[in-house]
Amino acid sequence: MAVGKNKRLSKGKKGIKKRVVDPFSRKDWYDIKAPSFFEVKNVGKTLVNRTAGLKNANDALKGRIVEVSLADLQKDEEHSFRKVKLRVDDVQGKACLTTFNGMSMTSDKLRSLVRKWQTTIEADQTIKTTDGYVCRIFVIGFTRRRYNQIKKTTYAQSSQIRAIRQKMFQVIQNQATGCSMRELVQKLIPEIIGREIEKATGGIFPLQNVFVRKVKILKSPKLDAQKLLEQHGEAQDVGTKVIKDVAPLASV
């Protein structure tokens, strides 16, 4: 007879059930606030465990990165191919104050731009803003037919590609250098950099569908609570003028 474990004898007591604890009972919801240079301030909500012992809920929230569609932030479906990254830098009450942490294009939009019979030209430039951010801007563009062109293909020569890339470097440097992160984002949203590149490269080879493909934050400045509040419009140097209603004089 084989010696082994008898499963029938090793069963525990009947009727005793393990206590089930709802994990959401120990969590709280926090609001995610976008900077004031976006039209929509309330991005959404995030979940975190409550403060217990040495584990602080605020520390768990700081550093979280959320990805939001620019169409939702600007209330405009034309920006639906843009994705914006926001990083939680501070927590005040139940509000998570975020800063801009990068931008990219959706893969379906990028794939729809790549076609036959044209040349794809890409460039990237590292710039530094006046408020201490170091970011790398990636640009992409495509050649198009000249006016009254009969030839089907629009391939650019190597010398033309190099010249166009140099123009891209110059435009990115001129548009991004000397401005703050707020001003840079306000240039990225309406595609100012892409339009300027199309104008600058028109004499070399006409381009179409020139976009800022990606913005990558390489280095962020040290957290300044005052500047963060200014980005969210919660601390302003100049207040709004208050006009009080003057009560009419009583008749004699």
Swiss-Prot record:
Record key words, sorted: Acetylation, Cytoplasm, Ribonucleoprotein, Ribosomal protein
Entries under Pfam families matching the protein: Ribosomal_S3Ae (PF01015)
Molecular function per GO: structural constituent of ribosome
Protein location: Cytoplasm
List of residues that carry N-acetylalanine: 2
Protein's UniProt keywords contain DNA repair: no
One example of a Gene Ontology biological process annotation: translation
GO cellular component: cytosol; cytosolic small ribosomal subunit
InterPro entries referenced in this protein's UniProt entry, alphabetically: Ribosomal_eS1, Ribosomal_eS1_CS, Ribosomal_eS1_euk
Tree of life domain: Eukaryota
Quaternary assembly: Component of the small ribosomal subunit. Mature ribosomes consist of a small (40S) and a large (60S) subunit. The 40S subunit contains about 33 different proteins and 1 molecule of RNA (18S). The 60S subunit contains about 49 different proteins and 3 molecules of RNA (25S, 5.8S and 5S).
Family from the record: Belongs to the eukaryotic ribosomal protein eS1 family.
HAMAP family: Ribosomal_eS1_euk
Protein name stated in the entry: Small ribosomal subunit protein eS1
Organism (species): Schizosaccharomyces japonicus (strain yFS275 / FY16936)
